[in-house]
Amino acid sequence: MKKKVKLRYDRIAIFAVFCFLVVFLFIKSITFLFSKINPKTEKYFLASISNKVNLYDKNKNKIKEENRGQEVFLYVDTIKDEYSKVKYQGKNYYVKNEELSKEYSDVVLIKDLYVRTATVLLDGISVLNYIPKGSKLEVLGFDEIDNNGNVFNYKVKYNNQVGYVNKEYLVGSKEESLINYDQNGNYLIHKARTSSYGGNAGDLDFYPRQKGNFQNNKMPDKVRALYLNGEAIYEAKDYIEIAKDSQINAFVINIKDDVLSYKSGVAKEISLRSYNNALGSIEKYKQNIELLKNNGYYLIGRISVFKDYAYALDNPNNAITDKNGDLYKHNGSYWPSAYNTNVWEYNLKLALEAIELFGFNEIQFDYVRFPDGTNSLEKDGVIDMKNNYNISKIQAIQTFLMYATDILHQKEVYVSADVFGESAHTYVNSYGQYWGAISNVVDVISAMPYPDHFNINQYGIEEPVWTNPYKLLYTWSKDFAMKRQSEIPTPAIMRTWIQAYNTTKTPAVEYNAEKIKEQIKGLEDGGAVGGYMTWNSVSSKSKYREIANSM
């Protein structure tokens, strides 16, 4: 009896094992079949040193290129030594394993980059450091990738500081970073130029740059502008009345000209004296700006950058000082140092604030220079320019303009820079202006060749030059400014300041409508056809009425 019971149990056990094996094999086969029908995948991203990744067929023949950063689905059971199978946009491809990343933040595979164009290390718009040409950077990541797989800004480490650098200024090798852009041998022309204590042109950057061209912010083909100082803007209605029956289509309006035109929130945080000394309120300023905008005028916001009495008093460590450490006064004002990146940031913040509050079409930087006539004082140690990065004056000016232009272009706003008429000559001047280094960077270069600023017989002109503004400005534009424009790959629009005030030199000359016409014709006959702006520091209504129809 016991044997029969034991035999029955054995049979049951064998049957149970058999059933388990059948079920197990059935499940395995179903799983296998399911995996063939619907194989397991995981999300990955295409990664590369460059902006493109190659996709292959099963025989490892290249089929197409796709942008770095694109999402794919990796077939987990296909991972091989070199290639893996992925699904992308509903189709199957093979990709090199090294060009697949589990994390989107790791899709940029390059480890080191080199600085082709001297630039700055940024945290937002804050400047952390100046980075010279040829410097090596450790790549830690990026901020964004565009639709073509290109990085906007690389996250890098430099001198133990972490920040971001514009991709346009970086290349893959040390050798490439040391090359100077030499279009048609023009770099050798710059390199041979003399320096007047402002730096060497051969140390500057002349690579082509993308100029502003914004669909939602169209610049007039030719700007014809009146200048409004910080007080005149509050009487915008009167200036509209003056301009309405003329060809005037724009206004240059002070944001800051040593004194702020309105009580800026940026200034309140950084320079309380500037805030307290402001000429008016944001509300009143905005009302007048909107009146101009509603009448169809193109608006240019003017900021005097490195001449700022109140800012220097509030921030003396950022300003030029004498040998005793006291603020140095030049031409009635204190000067923040153009070497100091805190000063750069303050003025850029003012520009960004003005764009947000008032909708300026363009930001114009004036006094983008060091104080003139001070090179002997600097050489003798009488003054301290605060050159913390050991760079030349023109290197500081060019880098500031690159920094500001890059950020303002993100706001779809144009950038212009004012320069002395002397800057069209063939040397780096002592206050840090060199035509090619500035025109190549900004959208508009605005020289100030006021006839009464020239020597009496400049350029061999027999009569006092301010008595014949046509001949003077024709010669200046044709033989100097236009030649400087031809020496760079991406010159700015040349929109020139013209003198709209009477000359008090001997012989005195009234700059009436006829003299305005002579200046304009001289510029345009000499090739400077990008427009003009009237300089009259007091924005005289009577003078503007007199000359409006001559523009």
Residue ranges of predicted features:
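Aromatic-lined carbohydrate-recognition surfaces of secreted/lumenal glycan-active proteins
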Residues: 298-308, 364, 391-430, 489-503, ...
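Catalytic domains of carbohydrate-active enzymes, especially glycoside hydrolases
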Residues: 236-261, 357-362, 444, 523-530
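SH3/SH3-like (including bacterial SH3b) beta-barrel domains
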Residues: 57-68, 119-136
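Boundary regions of SH3-family modules and the immediately adjacent low-complexity/disordered segments
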Residues: 37-42, 87-114, 152, 157-214
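SH3/SH3-like beta-barrel superfamily modules
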Residues: 67-96, 132-167
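Substrate-binding cleft of secreted/luminal carbohydrate-active enzymes
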Residues: 442-456, 466-474, 479-551
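Active-site-adjacent "subsite" loops/lids of carbohydrate-active enzymes
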Residues: 214-231, 289, 301, 305-353
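Aromatic-lined carbohydrate-binding/catalytic grooves of carbohydrate-active enzymes
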Residues: 246-280, 372-380
